[in-house]
Curated annotation (Swiss-Prot):
SMART domains: ZnF_C2H2
Record has Zinc as a keyword: yes
Assigned keywords, A-Z: Metal-binding, Nucleus, Repeat, Transcription, Transcription regulation, Zinc, Zinc-finger
UniProt function note: Transcription factor that acts in coordination with atrR to regulate the expression of the ABC-type multidrug transporter abcG1 and thus plays a role in azole susceptibility. Regulates the expression of genes involved in fermentation. Is able to promote expression from the yeast FLO11 promoter.
Lineage: Eukaryota, Fungi, Dikarya, Ascomycota, Pezizomycotina
Protein name per its UniProtKB record: C2H2-type transcription factor ffmA
Zinc finger (C2H2-type) stretch: 212-234, 240-265
Compartments it resides in: Nucleus
Main location: nucleus
Amino acid sequence: MPMPQYTMQPQYPVSQPHTLPPLQPHHSQSPAPHSYMGQPPYRPDLSRYPASTHDVYASSAAPIMPHTTVGSLPPSTFLSHHNHQAQAQQSQHYPPPPHNVLPPASSAQTYPQPIAPAPPRDRRPDFNGMPSGAFSYPDGKASPWMNPDPVAAANGAGAYGAKEPPRTQVVGSQGRRGILPSVPGRVAPVTNGVNGTAKNTTIPAKDADGKFPCPHCNKTYLHAKHLKRHLLRHTGDRPYMCVLCKDTFSRSDILKRHFQKCSIRRGNPTGATHLSHPQAHLKRSQAQAAANTAKSLQEEVSSTVPPSNGIAGATFSEGAVNGNGLGAGRPGFTDQQPLGFTMQSVNGLGRGQPDDAYAHGQAHQRASWMATPKQNPYLVQPGTEAPNQQLNVDRPTLEQAKPSVVDPKRPMMPGPDPNHGGGLDWTSMFQAGASDGYINQVFPQSMASGQEPIQAQVETERKFYPTTTTAGPQEGGMNGLYLASTTLGGDGK
């Protein structure tokens, strides 16, 4: 077997396993790199473009003279219908070598049929890894990665294969998918125009499954708003319009996404939103202006009666006391108490009956007493006349009818005579009918006149025991009371 002649062609790489002598040496040598990706000669489903950077043919329809090389099997793009003789000479002089020497894809002797010329390649070989439809060209040329038509390529026609229409990306194409046709036998939809509103669409009643059926097709929807959105596909209405570019959309969410980009591209100097339709905005402003006019007229024709000072009870009172009216017949409260007896008030300001803190003959003194400054109820002198009128109210019927109320923290114990002047008056201390509220006459006159006032709030841990001695009023800490010590010290003196 003759050895390959590497000296005749120094421009070819040594890695090629088999070379052939030139059959027609008068032709110019063309570089033929190993660019046919190792496929059999006639495989229309694979790409057959060489990797050279120049056009092989000037015209795809004219037959080409055979270009033969001294390298290994020439690519299929360099063969034509006229090179049967070259293939016969190859099969006679050089039988096929073993498979371990020659690549399995380069044994072209098993395919003696004529090979069709490939279409001329495009000048954009760098986008072979891109998917189809990634770009569109305005000159109408097909994409270089598009598979050509093998039938047209075999006939020498169709240089660019089957042409695809150029794909143009439309902003908001989600709402432009076309009008859905109606099912035969259903009612044809009535269009409202391109800018029709979606609110005047009549929603049919629910079917047996509790869903809303479409009157134009066989679809059903669980919610009425979804059916409304679907009906826009039948009518072709696009009720939502962009105020910046006057483009219309079928749904508000599509318009919102478009408006965010459109305001960046075109600018939004007025600060309008995606739902600021010009006509709707005009109607809204007119309605608001009409409402403001009606409101101003209503304020002008308002009542001439001056308003009160903000206290509703002041209009019913006999006279304002300290700026607050306390009416004899307040409208919000009834004169009859639900518990059967009169609830006592504190300092005459409770919400009982109107005159519950005063005798019937003392109602005229209400305003003058409340206008005077209050005195400490714990240091009241029983001999004075002015406070005595409010402390010793003549209520014989109430004191006889009601039992004495006992404070649980201060249990009442048997003690001295209630009428005794030197001891504590327990009935007057816890008298429920007393109008001064908490405790009346805690200290006797002898203690309150010359001694320092003792704290009225006594500790709850100590217990009161009545004394058996008749000593002076200052014995035992309080008059007539023995304070038991809570410590281990003794009697607490």
